[in-house]
Amino acid sequence: MAPGNEMQARNGGGAAMCAAGCGFFGSAATDGLCSKCYKQQQPQPRHLIGTAAGDSDKTSLKVVADLSTLVIKDNSGVGGEGTTVMAPPATVTKAKNRCKACRKKVGLLGFPCRCGGMFCGAHACAFDYKAAGREAIARHNPLVVAPKINKI
């Protein structure tokens, strides 16, 4: 047997070479092409063509540089068209990972306080939340004193 015949016998006898002539075997599912030639033949999406060719400057989207204010038209007014200018959203603060008292990095061992600070194991918040809670309850619930009843 010739070496070419052995390959055909192992592959089922019906394996054909790539129609593009690259030397690999093609399949009926890819129109007689190998996988590499089939991928090259398929049309690429437009957003991938520009980046593959190096023309990213031409296909890049136009970005608005100034996003400091948003203008929204308000058509609810009877007299005329008004505009409302809204401020940009507040900046996002990073997660606090240092002790508020000693500025030592606490990582996962730190514990947050209701005041918004982070503390290490050696320090704690100086604010007395128990006393503040007692004062708030006393302020919102005044003491009601009933007058004494006269005995008959």
From Swiss-Prot:
It holds the Pfam family zf-A20. Zn(2+) 1 binds at residues 18, 22, 34, 37. GO terms for molecular function: DNA binding; zinc ion binding. The lineage of its organism: Eukaryota, Viridiplantae, Streptophyta, Embryophyta, Tracheophyta. SUPFAM superfamilies: AN1-like Zinc finger (SSF118310), Glucocorticoid receptor-like (DNA-binding domain) (SSF57716). Zn(2+) 2 binds at residues 99, 102, 120, 123. A zinc finger (AN1-type) spans 93-139. The keyword Zinc applies. This is Zinc finger A20 and AN1 domain-containing stress-associated protein 10. The gene is SAP10. Gene3D superfamilies: 1.20.5.4770, AN1-like Zinc finger. Keywords: Metal-binding, Stress response, Zinc, Zinc-finger. May be involved in environmental stress response. The keyword Iron does not apply. Induction: By dehydration and salt stress. It comes from Oryza sativa subsp. japonica (Rice).
